[in-house]
Amino acid sequence: MEDDSLYLGGEWQFNHFSKLTSSRPDAAFAEIQRTSLPEKSPLSCETRVDLCDDLAPVARQLAPREKLPLSSRRPAAVGAGLQNMGNTCYVNASLQCLTYTPPLANYMLSREHSQTCHRHKGCMLCTMQAHITRALHNPGHVIQPSQALAAGFHRGKQEDAHEFLMFTVDAMKKACLPGHKQVDHHSKDTTLIHQIFGGYWRSQIKCLHCHGISDTFDPYLDIALDIQAAQSVQQALEQLVKPEELNGENAYHCGVCLQRAPASKTLTLHTSAKVLILVLKRFSDVTGNKIAKNVQYPECLDMQPYMSQQNTGPLVYVLYAVLVHAGWSCHNGHYFSYVKAQEGQWYKMDDAEVTAASITSVLSQQAYVLFYIQKSEWERHSESVSRGREPRALGAEDTDRRATQGELKRDHPCLQAPELDEHLVERATQESTLDHWKFLQEQNKTKPEFNVRKVEGTLPPDVLVIHQSKYKCGMKNHHPEQQSSLLNLSSSTPTHQESMNTGTLASLRGRARRSKGKNKHSKRALLVCQ
């Protein structure tokens, strides 16, 4: 077999088989059909991290990948707390989880991107680099996140933390790409962000009439888990990869025998990410009501049972961050997170407050988003820290992190926002708004009869609600310090120049929250006759 490929007019055609059909351009993934079930799939992976062999020629034709630092530059102890700027707990909780993602933090602290970045403004990677550097190098303090981090997303009210998380991840991925508009999907899959968070699904359909097999590979950055019938993350993953029978009206139209026939469909993870983002689907898309049930999740998770290739030994991930939502629906509540510092100690990051936490407390939360990293990756970064010079350990006086100068007390949530450090934060213009981004997400999806995120009340045009309680009545009893306050818009609303240009964002839900039974990308088919 020849190990080469041809690039013709935007189409990738592989010369690995005797007969090929023309592939459609601008494909997000490839579909391969075979006439019989082989003993070993020709698309099997040599390693979990790289693309499968038959897709490798595509990756080799692309620009070189950004290299991740081999050694850790991350301080061992926990960093700063984050000031709540008014309904921004969802921003703070998400940022803390990203800040304590070892591969991302080490890359940011190396400053490799900013030294070669050609964007004069609006670069999310540069903005995140400034934030992560400040957060990790200011233990015992409370810092104000840059307004540019949420520009185009935050509208003065609470939003969904997972949506903001993927908004940020997608913006960082776009910042890795060249400046020109037309970039193929394969280039996006070689970015720094895809190296850290990305992997590939393998959707395999076997025709029960001719035994032909169709393999479809689809990239992912996070994994959404249905928890309605699951008591644990492992059960939710088992349901996700459980074979599905296609028959009757749902019969499969086989591209080999060219007829509708019963088939078996199996979804598995073909390549594993360095960092897994597992999203527990707690909110109804229609009503916004929350599934407020306890779903067990382990400190160590073996992903091998859910991979395409078996019998290759355990693939162990360790938990390092948990994003928690406290409340009863997406319309109310409060977000905070737990993170694991490089030293191994867990901390609760609740806006400005940073307190030490036990693993028992971490594992007993009603988690919304779970962050796992491959055990080998975590150990590599931990060993690098232990060999290097560590900052001072977290003392008892730092356990409850509140600002010592101009202390941020929760009974005084109304604070005048200080000016941002100009040498750390870029000024940019806003092109993409949250409304536009959500419109792009929903344009191919059937919309409900009413808007579940509709603002129920109308405020005067000259006021802004600061950190309004999402618990309604319940928050007043348990968190009186988080009740609503008002701040003049003239002192808190970012100017047009302070907003960040994130560009036009592609649909995240159709890609990040992949449904088991649907293909949400255009496909290109390669018909193989053996």
UniProtKB/Swiss-Prot annotation:
EC number from the UniProt entry: 3.4.19.12
UniProt KW keywords: Endoplasmic reticulum, Hydrolase, Nucleus, Protease, Thiol protease, Ubl conjugation pathway
One Pfam family per UniProt: HABP4_PAI-RBP1
GO MF term (any one): cysteine-type deubiquitinase activity
Region (Disordered): 382-411, 477-530
Function field: Deubiquitinating enzyme that removes conjugated ubiquitin from specific proteins to regulate different cellular processes that may include cell proliferation, progression through the cell cycle, apoptosis, cell migration, and the cellular response to viral infection.
Keyword Lyase: no
Annotated catalysed reactions: Thiol-dependent hydrolysis of ester, thioester, amide, peptide and isopeptide bonds formed by the C-terminal Gly of ubiquitin (a 76-residue protein attached to proteins as an intracellular targeting signal)
Primary location recorded for the protein, binned into one broad class: nucleus
Location within or outside the cell: Nucleus; Endoplasmic reticulum
Family listed: Belongs to the peptidase C19 family. USP17 subfamily.
Basic residues composition-biased segments: 510-524
PANTHER family for the chain: INACTIVE UBIQUITIN CARBOXYL-TERMINAL HYDROLASE 17-LIKE PROTEIN 4-RELATED, UBIQUITIN CARBOXYL-TERMINAL HYDROLASE
SUPFAM superfamilies tied to this protein: Cysteine proteinases (SSF54001)
Active site: C89 (nucleophile), H334 (proton acceptor)
UniProt feature, compositional bias: Polar residues: 493-505
UniProt domain USP: residue ranges: 80-375
Keyword Nucleus: yes
One GO CC term, this protein: nucleus
Protein name as annotated: Ubiquitin carboxyl-terminal hydrolase 17-like protein 17
PROSITE patterns recorded: USP_1 (PS00972), USP_2 (PS00973), USP_3 (PS50235)
